[in-house]
Amino acid sequence: QGKFKPKIFLLADQGFSTYSTLIETRRELVEKKPDLVRRFVDASNIGWYNYIYGDNKAANALIKKFNPEMTDALLDYSVARMKEYGIVDSGDSVKLGIGAMTDARVKDFFDKMVRAGVLKPTLDYRQAYTLQFVNKGVGVDLRPKQ
């Protein structure tokens, strides 16, 4: 639309290794209702597979309802770029499923933040996340076979 080809710089290509999107909840909910949390995470992952690889017309209708400036063309373009650049489904998610997380990647980002002086090395960053609900391959069967 802008009549120019933008230059794209993915932060991940520059060594920024953190996750861009997370599902957050309270520790109390994880402890008291883990099945609820698991079902929410699983449904979110399945929803992403269906949106990116399946029929996303119903989802796009809701997006446009609450964001009237969005068009089918813009949404189609966005999905195509998400696929092209592996924004949602690439790296660890290829094997572990959308929403994949690893202790190694979280530690890598923590170490970078310590070196940059953003976080103290004594912070127990492991208390901030759990892998309990991810890395189970939920939805990978919905990805088209190549």
What would you call each of these model-derived segments?
Residues 12, 28-30, 140-146:
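Short, structured secondary-structure boundary patches
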Residues 20-35:
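A bilobed periplasmic-binding-protein/Venus flytrap-type ligand-binding module shared by bacterial periplasmic
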Residues 1, 26, 65:
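Ligand-binding pocket segment of bilobal, Venus flytrap-like solute-binding proteins
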Residues 9-24:
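Extracytoplasmic ligand-binding site segments that recognize negatively charged/polar headgroups
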